Amino acid sequence: MAFKQLFAAITVALSLTAANAAVVKEKRATCANGKTVGDASCCAWFDVLDDIQANMFHGGQCGAEAHESIRLVFHDSIAISPAMEAKGKFGGGGADGSIMIFDTIETAFHPNIGLDEVVAMQKPFVQKHGVTPGDFIAFAGAVALSNCPGAPQMNFFTGRKPATQPAPDGLVPEPFHTVDQIIARVNDAGEFDELELVWMLSAHSVAAVNDVDPTVQGLPFDSTPGIFDSQFFVETQFRGTLFPGSGGNQGEVESGMAGEIRIQTDHTLARDSRTACEWQSFVGNQSKLVDDFQFIFLALTQLGQDPNAMTDCSDVIPLSKPIPGNGPFSFFPPGKSHSDIEQACAETPFPSLVTLPGPATSVARIPPHKA
């Protein structure tokens, strides 16, 4: 379904839910564990939740397993092309789990390198609980985000049928693609515009890279990879000065902090006139970050699906955790200041931020998957 149609469907659904709640008591079902949901079919997902929190996310941590589960959502969902369909070619099924069903094919695609590990990690849970791969990928991604302090309250809908064929290669954006290429790709996938593209990249707030630089693993995109905040949007605007590893890798540019990786697409989107002001708008604005990402994540997980035929099981997703402490949502790390910013938005100045005290340090790597 095209994004604008999807937007209308989601908006109507949310409006009807609010209206119904104001008139009559919402119809609920009570599960065996005593928790209530809007639809009885959602009860089975509590067993899945308990299992993956204990045995995949190690007690609800926002670590490597969570980061890779979030990445898997995007790589599965974005693989859809109405433009190819219009030419009589199969354009992929979007959020249909094809990357897991046809993993030997799709994880070999260049932008999906490294995802074979998270697919292998998730497959046993799919088989154990008898859910579809598409539903599980969306569920695991939503739960993973709920484990990261500061993330939105995530939504989750079921009803994705198993993919019947693999998505074509070439539909997942690469770190070395131009801004024009990436905007065109997301516009084809769901009629997303350049602003909504920036919303998608909020996921890099809780992410790391294992395969851009072959000499080093677990390189985060910002200094707070375990927290869903706007530091990613601050630190990508620092003037690039160094590489965290070997350097000179395809799709990598110099970052502004030791131990932190910066991919070419993030660097150029932060500075392109079409996206720079939206990029900067998240700095110091946690509520905008949360609202926009909550919407775009749901939209992505419903690409290729009919939202009206899906079941809302958002009740199963844990409450998101608040950002710990009383510190600012955006800040300059120790040793950094406004003079390190490469101002790109021509409409408004870069926000005034505090610099945290202490000496400048290297950003720690993300530990690999736990056995």
Swiss-Prot record:
Q: Which InterPro entries match?
A: Ccp1-like, Haem_peroxidase, Haem_peroxidase_sf, Ligninase, Ligninase_C, Peroxidases_AS, Peroxidases_heam-ligand_BS
According to UniProt, this protein's pathway is:
Secondary metabolite metabolism; lignin degradation
Q: What class of enzyme is it?
A: oxidoreductase
Identify the domain of life: Eukaryota
Keyword DNA-binding assigned: no
* Annotated positions binding Ca(2+) 1: 76, 94, 96, 98
Which residues, if any, are the signal sequence? 1-21
Q: Where does Ca(2+) 2 bind?
A: 205, 222, 224, 227, 229
Residues at which heme b binds: 204
Write down how the cofactor binds this protein. Binds 2 calcium ions per subunit. Binds 1 heme b (iron(II)-protoporphyrin IX) group per subunit.
Catalyzed reactions per annotation: 1-(3,4-dimethoxyphenyl)-2-(2-methoxyphenoxy)propane-1,3-diol + H2O2 = 3,4-dimethoxybenzaldehyde + guaiacol + glycolaldehyde + H2O; 2 (3,4-dimethoxyphenyl)methanol + H2O2 = 2 (3,4-dimethoxyphenyl)methanol radical + 2 H2O
GO terms (molecular function) for this protein are: diarylpropane peroxidase activity; heme binding; metal ion binding
What this protein is reported to do is described as: Depolymerization of lignin. Catalyzes the C(alpha)-C(beta) cleavage of the propyl side chains of lignin.
Q: Which family does it belong to?
A: Belongs to the peroxidase family. Ligninase subfamily.
UniProt protein name: Ligninase LG2
Annotated source species: Phanerodontia chrysosporium
Gene responsible for this protein: GLG2
